[in-house]
């Protein structure tokens, strides 16, 4: 049985949390529980080691600290499974403390698996444990190595391992937890160095948040200023902090740093865009309110970050796609008509959610190609329970070629099945 839930406004943290909590509760109530046969741990390890966990490990929405709470930035460039040893995953990445950027290489060694609580019959949940060591480049200033223990929650769906964020939005949610130390090559001194998704292990002296990670006031000066200021989304200072948080710092000298400044001219709200602090262009958003949120993600799957502006008072966004040919952002009118788009990366699709009536919600799936965005399928569902009312599939000419009333999960197209698992469940 399926439960559909959407984060329709990414800037509304409380809405996100509420929807994901409702989704989890409904799954627990409505799903058919799948228990595990009691399998010896070594047998379970053997079964699960055949999967590739590169994408589970390759999460870069990491928060970290070193020593007494100084902010630690970590980024993985590549993670891949060893061809000979299924326990080993080779890692390359970057670390940063203050302005000191280092490259590192290393390995994550998986050593055990355990089943996790099941909430849906269409996939299975597990936890893995591992050890890690990441060696920074010895020729770089202030370098050393990271070492410690690691844990991660994941799901198995259609014979593939995926990162488990079903409980994202719940108080205390965390995943991909790295807990250990950093040791200096030069002095041999060690410092606690922990990082993870959602929360940081052993961070009680730093994190005082309940619903989400929140830095205690007396440690915010330790590199957390922009992180905390970015919570003030409607202020100029908050927007400046958000631009800082969105930086691709791991690219070093090759980074393209996008920032912006708002202004109003003749009643029109505009954003001046800067690339590496040099003026690039002005985006005219029209006669709207001045409360907005910027989202720098890839909306047309071409490898470039785009510039989307959420308009608070209209609950809509305007999307400006990066044009390599023109060297600037270009308005994409397709998104103007959407109510609540979600980026479905795995399929190069955009899925939009809109209310048909009080009792019906429609999900529209558009596939992105060089020719633009094309509607390929729709779902009608009840807004407050798991009932799917209708599915339609469309051909290239926009004709409906398949229609199913009250479809079951197995009757959904493979793309809808995957979307349900990866996105409706918080992936």
Task: For the regions a language model picked out, list residue spans one by one.
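Bacterial Sec-dependent N-terminal signal peptides
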Residues: 1-40
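Terminal domain-start segments
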Residues: 37-86, 230-294, 397-427
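Tryptophan-anchored aromatic micro-motifs
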Residues: 38-77, 85-95, 124-142, 172-188, ...
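Beta-propeller blade repeat segments, especially FG-GAP/WD-type strand-to-loop junctions
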Residues: 274-276, 315-332, 365-370
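Beta-propeller blade termini
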Residues: 290-299, 338-349
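Beta-propeller fold detector
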Residues: 330-336, 375-380
């Amino acid at each position: 049985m399926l439960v559909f839930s959407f984060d329709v406004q990414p800037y509304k943290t409380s809405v996100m949390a509420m929807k994901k909590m409702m989704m989890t509760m409904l799954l627990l109530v409505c799903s058919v529980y799948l228990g595990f046969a009691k399998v010896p741990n070594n047998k379970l390890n053997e079964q699960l080691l055949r999967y590739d966990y590169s994408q589970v490990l390759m999460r870069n929405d990491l928060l970290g600290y070193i020593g007494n709470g100084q902010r630690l930035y970590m980024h993985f460039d590549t993670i891949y499974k060893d061809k000979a040893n299924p326990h080993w995953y080779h890692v390359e990445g970057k670390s940063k403390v203050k302005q000191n950027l280092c490259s590192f290489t290393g390995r994550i060694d998986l050593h055990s698996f355990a089943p996790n609580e099941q909430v849906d019959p269409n996939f299975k949940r597990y936890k893995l444990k591992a050890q890690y060591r990441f060696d920074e480049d010895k020729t770089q200033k202030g370098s050393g190595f990271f070492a410690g223990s690691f844990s991660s929650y994941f799901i198995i769906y259609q014979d593939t391992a995926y990162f488990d964020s079903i409980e994202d939005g719940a108080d205390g949610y965390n995943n991909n937890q790295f807990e250990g130390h950093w040791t200096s090559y030069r002095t041999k001194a060690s410092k606690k160095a922990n990082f993870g998704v959602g929360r940081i292990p052993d961070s009680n002296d730093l994190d005082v948040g309940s619903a989400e990670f929140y830095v205690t006031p007396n440690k915010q000066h330790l590199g957390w200023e922009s992180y905390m200021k970015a919570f003030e989304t409607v202020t100029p200072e908050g927007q400046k902090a958000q631009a800082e948080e969105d930086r691709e710092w791991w690219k070093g000298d090759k980074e393209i740093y996008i920032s912006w400044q708002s202004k109003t001219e003749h009643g029109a709200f505009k954003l001046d865009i800067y690339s590496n602090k040099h003026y690039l262009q002005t985006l005219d958003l029209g006669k709207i309110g001045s409360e907005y949120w910027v989202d720098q993600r890839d909306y047309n799957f071409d490898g470039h970050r785009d510039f989307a502006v959420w308009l608070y008072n209209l609950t809509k966004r305007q999307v400006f796609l990066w044009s390599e040919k023109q060297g600037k952002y270009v308005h994409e009118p397709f998104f103007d008509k959407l109510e609540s788009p979600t980026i479905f990366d795995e399929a190069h699709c955009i899925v939009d959610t809109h209310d048909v009536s009080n009792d019906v919600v429609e999900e529209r799936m558009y596939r992105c190609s060089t020719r633009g965005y094309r509607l390929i399928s729709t779902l009608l569902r009840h807004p407050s329970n798991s009932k799917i009312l209708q599915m339609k599939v469309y051909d290239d000419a926009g004709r409906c070629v398949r229609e199913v009333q009250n479809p079951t999960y197995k009757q959904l197209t493979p793309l809808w099945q995957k979307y349900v698992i990866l996105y409706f469940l918080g992936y």
